UniProtKB/Swiss-Prot annotation:
Molecular function per GO: ATP binding; cobalt ion binding; flavin adenine dinucleotide binding; succinate dehydrogenase (quinone) activity; succinate dehydrogenase activity
GO biological process: mitochondrial electron transport, succinate to ubiquinone; tricarboxylic acid cycle
Membrane topology value: Peripheral membrane protein
Binding site for substrate: H285, T297, H396, R441
Top-rank EC class of the record's enzyme: oxidoreductase
Designated name of the protein: Succinate dehydrogenase [ubiquinone] flavoprotein subunit 1, mitochondrial
Binding of FAD, residues: 56-61, 79-94, 264, 430, 446-447
Source species: Arabidopsis thaliana (Mouse-ear cress)
Enzyme nomenclature, EC number: 1.3.5.1
Similarity comment: Belongs to the FAD-dependent oxidoreductase 2 family. FRD/SDH subfamily.
Annotated catalytic residues: R329 (proton acceptor)
């Protein structure tokens, strides 16, 4: 049975309680055998009421929580990790903003580069908002205490990054990336956590969010989460729920992502019957360490690093004559892959490329790239002052995610409206798809994305609601299906360990949805990923406890990954063109007439259904005109 404990914060918590006696009819009832005739289980349910709930405590989640607290909202932040272990900590290169500290710059030039980088799949209203707000966001971080690297004059140091230019692509390389050496994400996350602690944000650390609590009218009323420490279940009722749960890089075998990047928020949205957008666009970072997958920042090339093949040739001069090694990431990753395919890879198996930093002055490496020097020594056994680093394109970022407008509000198609807002639900950061990155993200736009749109979510909440507003009670059966499903999953007695299914999924994604794709590999991938999902019905969870059950948590994460992976593969198979990170060998050209539109992937009855919505080509106002599509050359 349920034992329901009500806790009131600001507004009285819902007094609704229900009984759970092996609830039948759960979503996955056909999947999981409990191996017992008595399916009754006892779960303690704790109810909370907040003005706003943020799920995730990385850069986007913390910035949203800070903003909400500043506006006076009673805010909870739920996170499965201690906040400073969130994956923002791994970001290295920096944060883009047209500060003009190294040369003249303009946010409009930054916007042009971002639209071009997105291969014209980015929404230009959202891109305008992000780039225009960028200088303000960086100065705000400086005021929070972020220890940026400095020029001799004391200004924030800015380095060159890929795909960035002056004067709408006509003025040469831009120096737009503000950084804290090569540990910018670490500095940012700790700075924001300090600010969040200063405000009255209530943190629920090591709570695993399970599902959204959706009302019958289609609005979101909060989330249900599992406290991993004691096994209690918590229903968080709120006027606004902000998902900042990061990407799902761990759907692939080799990724720069932490093992916690499992697309939990995306899957929660998909299970609620809402779409995910543009998941086929997965960024491969050009320089992951060969064999280990650890990231070597693009800043290493921004500081003068050079990619060379087995012949010692600086081959990027052939593929991107102007930008060379600082072309956009999808361009560099494809170029490296082609060099390897054509037999000019390095190493005994000729299956990777060398990144040379050994021509740079040691003092530059020590001051600007200290983390890279350490990472290369540990994971590649390389002294960067003397030897090149072996690198290979590695899964790094998900351009797709939960579709939102530039306020951070989650949107879907309703009737003739492709931008219908879901009341009470927002998203920010890598989990969201605003879409400011379109088909390919520019380096150093992700840290910008998380702080600009985390703040935008908080500001939008302040515009549409007030602290302490009365909330509707939760629906009588709120969370019931989730608890039934959790119980069956915890007691599942199949034959396949979680790790076996996960490894199979990762190999399918790595082999069939990689840098280059064909109809054959994608069709095979769709069949294989569907079978991988079916195999999840035979999953085995050995640990039956509710306290620190890592077996159960990894299985929950695997389900989330499988949903993301399935929508990714089916979306990629359907898109018959090459655009940004989605490179088809059988459809090599960008087809704006038919395919300049966002893919929407729905998870319905454990199958993927696809739909489409238009790209926002219009800008917010007359400050800048729309950038019409043209050939993307670097």
């Amino acid at each position: 049975m349920w034992r329901c404990v009500s806790r009131g914060f600001r507004a009285p918590a819902s007094k609704t309680s229900s009984l759970f006696d092996g609830v039948s009819g759960s979503r996955f009832s056909r999947f999981f055998s409990t191996g017992s005739t008595d399916t009754r289980s006892s779960y303690t349910i704790v109810d909370h009421t907040y003005d706003a709930v943020v799920v995730g405590a990385g850069g986007a989640g913390l910035r949203a929580a800070i903003g909400l607290s500043e506006h006076g909202f009673n805010t909870a932040c739920i996170t499965k990790l201690f906040p400073t272990r969130s994956h923002t900590v791994a970001a290295q290169g920096g944060i883009n903003a047209a500060l003009g500290n190294m040369s003249e710059d303009d946010w409009r030039w930054h916007m042009y580069d971002t639209v071009k980088g997105s291969d014209w799949l980015g929404d230009q209203d959202a891109i305008q908002y992000m780039c225009r707000e960028a200088p303000k966001a960086v100065i705000e971080l400086e005021n929070y205490g972020l220890p940026f690297s400095r020029t001799e004059e004391g200004k924030i140091y800015q380095r060159a990054f890929g795909g960035q230019s002056l004067d709408f692509g006509k003025g040469g390389q831009a120096y737009r990336c503000a950084c804290a050496a090569d540990r910018t994400g670490h500095a940012l996350l700790h700075t924001l956590y300090g600010q969040a602690m200063k405000h009255n944000t209530q943190f629920f650390v090591e709570y695993f969010a399970l599902d959204l609590l959706m009302a019958s009218d289609g609005s979101c009323q909060g989330v249900i989460a599992l406290n991993m420490e004691d096994g209690t279940l918590h229903r968080f009722r709120s006027s606004q729920t902000i998902l900042a749960t990061g990407g799902y890089g761990r759907a692939y075998f080799s990724a720069t992502s932490a093992h916690t990047c499992t697309g939990d928020g995306n899957a929660m949205v998909a299970r609620a019957g809402l779409p995910l957008q543009d998941l086929e666009f997965v960024q491969f970072h050009p320089t992951g360490i060969y064999g280990a997958g650890c990231l070597i920042t693009e800043g290493s090339r921004g500081e003068g690093g050079i990619l060379r093949n087995s012949e010692g040739e600086r081959f990027m001069e052939r593929y991107a004559p102007t930008a060379k090694d600082l072309a956009s990431r999808d361009v560099v990753s494809r170029s490296m892959t082609m060099e390897i395919r054509e037999g000019r890879g390095v190493g005994p198996h000729k299956d990777h490329i060398y990144l040379h930093l050994n021509h740079l002055p040691p003092e530059v490496l020590k001051e600007r790239l200290p983390g890279i020097s350490e990472t290369a020594a540990i994971f590649a056994g390389v002294d960067v002052t003397k030897e090149p680093i072996p690198v290979l394109p590695t899964v790094h970022y998900n351009m797709g995610g939960i579709p939102t407008n530039y306020h951070g509000e989650v949107v879907t198609i309703k009737g003739d409206d492709p931008d219908a807002v879901i009341p009470g639900l927002m998203a920010a950061g890598e989990a969201a798809c605003a879409s400011v990155h379109g088909a390919n993200r520019l380096g150093a736009n992700s840290l910008l994305d998380i702080v600009v749109f985390g703040r935008a979510c908080a500001n939008r909440v302040a515009e549409i609601s007030k602290p302490g507003e009365k909330q509707k009670p939760l629906e009588k059966d709120a969370g019931e299906k989730t608890i039934a499903w959790l119980d069956r999953l915890r007691n599942s007695n199949g034959s396949l360990p979680t790790s076996t299914i996960r490894l199979n999924m990762q190999r399918i994604m790595q082999n069939n949805a990689a840098v280059f794709r064909t109809q054959e590999t994608l069709e095979e991938g769709c069949q294989l990923i569907d079978k991988a999902w079916e195999s999840f019905g035979d999953v085995q969870v050995k640990d039956r406890s509710m306290i620190w059950n890592s077996d159960l948590i990894e299985t929950l994460e695997l389900e989330n990954l499988l949903i993301n992976a399935s929508i990714t593969m089916h979306s990629a198979e359907a898109r018959k063109e090459s655009r940004g990170a989605h490179a088809r060998e059988d459809f090599t050209k960008r087809e704006d007439g038919e395919w300049m539109k966002h893919t929407l992937g729905y998870w319905e009855d454990e199958k993927v259904r696809l739909d489409y919505r238009p790209v926002h080509m219009d800008t917010l106002d007359d400050e800048i005109d729309t950038f019409p599509p043209k050939a993307r050359v670097y």
